[in-house]
Amino acid sequence: MDEFCNSTFWNLSLLKSPEADLPLCFEQTVLVWIPLGFLWLLAPWQLYRIYRSRTKRFAITKFYLAKQVFVVCLLILAAIDLSLALTEDTGQATIPPVKYTNPILYLCTWLLVLVIQHCRQCCIQKNSWFLSMFWILSLLCGIFQFQTLIRALLQDSKSNMTYSCLFFVSYGFQIVILILSAFSESSDSTHAPSATASFLSSVTFSWYDSTVLKGYKHPLTIEDVWDIEENLKAKSLTSKFKTIMTKDLQKARQALQRRLKKSQQSPEGTSHGLTKKQSQSQDVLVLEDSKKKKKKSEATKDFPKSWLVKALFKTFYVVILKSFILKLAHDILLFLNPQLLKFLIGFVKDPDSYPWVGYIYAILMFSVTLIQSFFLQCYFQFCFVLGMTVRTTIIASVYKKALTLSNLARRQYTIGETVNLMSVDSQKLMDVTNYIHLLWSSVLQIALSIFFLWRELGPSILAGVGLMVLLVPVNGVLATKIRKIQVQNMKNKDKRLKIMNEILSGIKILKYFAWEPSFKEQVNSIRKKELRNLLRFSQLQTILIFILHLTPTLVSVITFSVYVLVDSQNVLNAEKAFTSITLFNILRFPLAMLPMVISSVIQASVSVDRLEQYLGSDDLDLSAIRHVCHFDKAVQFSEASFTWDRDLEATIQDVNLDIKPGQLVAVVGTVGSGKSSLISAMLGEMENVHGHITIKGSIAYVPQQAWIQNGTIKDNILFGSEYDEKKYQRVIEACALLPDLEMLPGGDMAEIGEKGINLSGGQKHRVSLARATYQDADIYILDDPLSAVDTHVGKHIFNKVVGPNGLLSGKTRILVTHGIHFLPQVDEIVVLGKGTILEKGSYSDLMDKKGVFAKNWKTFMKHSGPEGEATVDNDSEEEDGDCGLIPTVEEIPDDAASLTMRRENSLRRTLSRSSRSGSRRGKSLKSSLKIKSVNALNKKEEVVKGQKLIKKEFVETGKVKFSIYLKYLQAVGWWSLLFIVIFYVLNYVAFIGTNLWLSAWTSDSEKQNGTDNSPSQRDMRIGVFGALGIAQGIFLLSSSLWSIYACRNASKTLHRQLLTNILRAPMSFFDTTPTGRIVNRFAGDISTVDDTLPQTLRSWLLCFFGIVSTLVMICMATPIFIIIIIPLSILYVSVQVFYVATSRQLRRLDSVTKSPIYSHFSETVSGLPVIRAFEHQQRFLANSEKQIDTNQKCVFSWITSNRWLAIRLELVGNLIVFCSALLLVIYKNSLTGDTVGFVLSNALNITQTLNWLVRMTSEVETNIVAVERINEYINVDNEAPWVTDKKPPADWPKKGEIQFNNYQVRYRPELDLVLKGITCNIKSTEKVGVVGRTGAGKSSLTNCLFRILESAGGQIIIDGIDIASIGLHDLRGRLTIIPQDPILFSGNLRMNLDPFNKYSDEEIWRALELAHLKSFVAGLQLGLLHEVTEGGDNLSIGQRQLLCLGRAVLRKSKILVLDEATAAVDLETDSLIQTTIRNEFSQCTVITIAHRLHTIMDSDKIMVLDSGKIVEYGSPEELLSNMGPFYLMAKEAGIESVNHTEL
């Protein structure tokens, strides 16, 4: 090589001088060829990747041109260099070959760079990481030649002037190109710039600067956050996961079958049952739940296992592999620093060492820590994004599974439990994925630590290793116990959330009956168990952490003791001690993290089991539902038998039924006859026993309990279909919605609350019907859609929509109905009884047969009178009038005084005119509605007052208020906080003492000139060192245990306050707040306060005191370091402050964007039969994926913000290491080896601690947001006090007299009055019927009596007491209501009747007897203890309503309110309820709100409401003779006098 350069290639003597240098030949060959070799080796792979990308997006940009121009300049410089070499080669002097080869190599290299840059610009448009690495390598290798040439020039050597100038210019160009490579092309895309960021920008996360700057200037909004790349979106992830999951799940199912065969267990043993909201109601009661409970616990053990983790690994193996490589590289570099520390101590101790050696060590130490930081942060980015994508995949997969889950499988999961899978379990998997590599990395680090410690201390290390081995089984036992507790705690969380879901769903019933304390006690009882388990969990976890924190200290004490005791020649000097201490510090991290990761894996394994069971459950089996295109029947049942549960008898038995296309078929039957089950079977919601159903065409479905989405009325009706104005107007007119839309603020753009909370029952049903009518389906399945509407509205809807001349005429219509007066108009009637068809045929055929139908018809006619006989008039003018508003008294002609024939004819003419004016009014409403819709679309910013119901979730901005920290610390307890801090301070005082004592111990050897000191001195050193180490552990244990108890009390306090306040919130709060949003507080936020926040606070305190103690020790050893610490501290704090605003707001956005995911899921599950019937699963899935992606982009941005900060703060830590090393080199003559070891061993530790402090600071502020969100709901305005000092007499109300004095009320302050000056007197024991069209204010009147709505003026006086002056529970506890929607809660029947256990069993059985349920309940195996499923879904609507009657009979208050209680039941159940009320409440005041006029014709008085005012009030006889609005309504119902109806 000497001949190649014509100079010396290598000379070791050049390094043995104060001014060492490398030979120029070495610099011009090896250091030139290293970067060029790197480029040429990787170039083929790079070009192949570019070729494979196949995307042609070439664009000439300034950056591209600038880089190409500078490379061309380098090309020109290489050409000049070559030409100069050729010019110099005159033959007289020998030109060394290096002069030719290097320019030629550079010429080829720069040409290759030009090609690569051009190709990347065409195809990838992202700077190459390997080109950036090439420029960095080239500059690093060139720096040696750079300084050699400068030295030569300084020595006046002009022989190389030309070459030197060319080199300097070339070096400058390379620096410029590297700087240009750090920038990326600007993009107009809404996606994060990470996809197009340069290599340097990627590793430093500089592409995120703009977001941090934006977040610092003003609080970030969702629009400010970059969108995520397509491959990270839910649709892309689930698509890939689904493919892999299907294969692995199939294998797992096969393995399950093999297991079952081996254990000789029958697969039929699995327990299933009814699902939630099956077709919204069931006429079948599933018996013997108790029998199946035992089976269920056994069955849940048998499900496909061990497939989820495999499927996730196969889905994300590329990212896992990349993060593995980065972590491996980081771990290897981690062990270079102890060796460099050893060399640096040796350098300081050696007085003859050259200064440049020390500087090299300092630079190497800085370089190693810097590269470590880059590797670590890139590794973290990969892992956290992996965790995010795993969570997204799980959430999206759970949602997707919910759309296809079979009813038998779905029954095992309540909405609350499934939301838990999406929120808690997916989060557990995300957490464990973030740190999954630590499982092998910790083992590797422990192994390498032991290896290097062996090199330092020899076999003595085995004593320490032995101790670690002994502690492994202890940790294993603790970990097993932790898992068991975790499993139990997850069950407790599920139970608590299940009850919370029910409470929030039935909050109105709780308020009506003043049952909040009972349900609060139930939640608190579960919460108590949950906190007890949480305490045990935290105690075991603390002991585990204590053992692992103490392990490195004990290991170092034992190792050093054994080392100095086994051989008197073994001297503990600074090099051995502090190199070992640095290795022990490295060992501390894996030993601390390994149990935490194992604990996370254990927790995640519980979640994996739960997810495997759910995702592995059976899907709907639709094989028995055959959809055909060419068939002469619309629907055909062929020997069809279906069941809700395979363990029970078939609900639908051997049904044979043919329905022709275009037919209107009515399905009738008594309660529990199987009407809704027949429909559910058609929809594929039931299990097939045998036979099949053939269906031709698409289906539209109207459920018995209307399912309404949270959105506008228009959105609900369109239901994803395109808007056709003419069709839309026809539908809303036909469904009698025009008057309602006129009254609603915003018209059809008015927002409907969750589950249609701000609509009346009738309005909900009509919106549900309009949704189906708007769809262009072939078959319409209508499950009693007319039950909740007024008689005249029902007739209008039948004529305009369902009947022979309605919008759906010509379509196949299957109508389940209790309104028998429509039956003469249908094509065929199907009579069901006990799941079989008793009779079928036309109305006339069945009447002629004189069978079951004819017999029941006559029975009902006796009870219902002319209303039942009324046929539907097809006169179009009258139909138009039916949907009009009730005419006011002024509209009735003055001469209508008597009911003579002449007057009747006159009235008919008046009615005809009224109908025509009603028709005109309908048209004017239609036009006004159009205007409203257009205005709403064109001027979205001008929101009509009251149009917006659901409030947008409030997002706090700016720094978390100090009051929130105080709120939490107050809950923790100030004394507890003081003692926790004291113990942490004592822990670190002991830590500093340990380091100082070790420093003094190592200095003994230097004082003794390398010989061993006296045994007594040695023993004292060992004893004190060990005592200080143990003291550290004891103080840490004390602080941790104290914090556990304190934080548990904080959790208990916050949950109690939250629950209490939510239960005391007024109904207006629940009207405007989605359930999912409230549940999120009880699920995610409470979980954070329980688990995450206490751990984060403990970690923050450890990190904070760790850094303070380290800096104190460094400053004690080298006081001059204070000068460096000040600017570095300012930089550290400023960067953190700069960042924290962004991180904090992103966490808030994360929390806010989570709620819609869960709300949408709850909404989807409750409306699954409708969604599946309309085949809209894909649309709902896309909507869910969109909401998940919105949340994802906040999470991704937050993850990146952490990396952005960490890389900058680690740079601060690395500078501390560099400055410490540099100062030690500069002041080496005044320092000893133990001081150097003492300073640097702590400085090396600070980088990691600084990083953790930043993360913990961010985590504390992030997690304290949970307290902020909980506090937001703790401070929600309460309704009036439950109990006040002014208590009514014990027997109040004694008479039941009710007096309304100019009573006014509105739903919310910004809305208009709904009751406008109601004044009337209701006497004791009077029976008052309240009538009026939908929206007239009937239900509002009920709400006022119970003070669900508070007065806006006037008063209500009951028995001489103003109800506003007493407590709510004193009022509500003395009144009784049978509500419109019969809501039951999960629990036994007894609890549903008497949650406070106030009544004896005898009283309850009597109430059941009077409610006509005694024989039914007595027939149940568990009787009163029979379990009711969530929402009472294992009871039919009729049975639920009878149970509500039982509640009323049991309470037997002096005042009873029936709020349209019989609207959704058949006439038989209606008759039963009316009979009981008439007999049992004869001495009570009864207010009945009814649609069926015959139910109130025996009332003492009737109140007619319209637009919030009383338009008529008097006895039925008076009102009929007045020929006012009530007379018109009675006329429509076929009732002309009180005598015509009998009840």
UniProtKB/Swiss-Prot annotation:
Gene3D superfamilies assigned: ABC transporter type 1, transmembrane domain (1.20.1560.10), P-loop containing nucleotide triphosphate hydrolases (3.40.50.300)
Pfam families recorded: ABC_membrane, ABC_tran, TMD0_ABC
One example of a Gene Ontology biological process annotation: xenobiotic export from cell
Modified positions (Phosphoserine) in chain numbering: 279, 281, 876, 924, 928, 1436
Primary subcellular site in the record, as a coarse category: membrane
Binding site for ATP 2: 1332-1339
UniProt biased composition (Polar residues): 263-283
Compartment(s): Apical cell membrane
Residue ranges of the region described as Disordered: 260-285, 903-927
Residues carrying covalently attached carbohydrate according to the record: 6, 11, 160, 1009
Catalysed reactions, as listed in the record: an S-substituted glutathione(in) + ATP + H2O = an S-substituted glutathione(out) + ADP + phosphate + H(+); taurolithocholate 3-sulfate(in) + ATP + H2O = taurolithocholate 3-sulfate(out) + ADP + phosphate + H(+); ATP + H2O + xenobioticSide 1 = ADP + phosphate + xenobioticSide 2; leukotriene C4(in) + ATP + H2O = leukotriene C4(out) + ADP + phosphate + H(+)
Domain ABC transmembrane type-1: 320-603, 977-1262
Tagged with keyword Zinc: no
Sample GO molecular function, one term: ABC-type glutathione S-conjugate transporter activity
All residue ranges annotated as the ABC transporter domain in the record: 635-859, 1298-1532
EC numbers on record: 7.6.2.-, 7.6.2.2, 7.6.2.3
Swiss-Prot/TrEMBL keywords: ATP-binding, Cell membrane, Glycoprotein, Lipid transport, Membrane, Nucleotide-binding, Phosphoprotein, Repeat, Translocase, Transmembrane, Transmembrane helix, Transport
Membrane-spanning residues: 27-47, 68-88, 93-113, 126-146, 165-185, 312-332, 359-379, 436-456, 460-480, 543-563, 586-606, 970-990, 1032-1052, 1096-1116, 1118-1138, 1210-1230, 1233-1253
Tissue expression: Expressed in liver.
InterPro entries assigned to the protein according to its UniProt record, in alphabetical order: AAA+_ATPase (IPR003593), ABC1_TM_dom (IPR011527), ABC1_TM_sf (IPR036640), ABC_transporter-like_ATP-bd (IPR003439), ABC_transporter_C-like (IPR050173), MRP (IPR005292), P-loop_NTPase (IPR027417), TMD0_ABC (IPR056227)
PROSITE patterns with a match to the protein in the record: ABC_TM1F (PS50929), ABC_TRANSPORTER_2 (PS50893)
Residues exposed to the Cytoplasmic side: 48-67, 114-125, 186-311, 380-435, 481-542, 607-969, 1053-1095, 1139-1209, 1254-1543
Free-text function comment from the UniProt entry: ATP-dependent transporter of the ATP-binding cassette (ABC) family that binds and hydrolyzes ATP to enable active transport of various substrates including many drugs, toxicants and endogenous compound across cell membranes. Transports a wide variety of conjugated organic anions such as sulfate-, glucuronide- and glutathione (GSH)-conjugates of endo- and xenobiotics substrates. Mediates hepatobiliary excretion of mono- and bis-glucuronidated bilirubin molecules and therefore play an important role in bilirubin detoxification.
Name of the protein in question: ATP-binding cassette sub-family C member 2
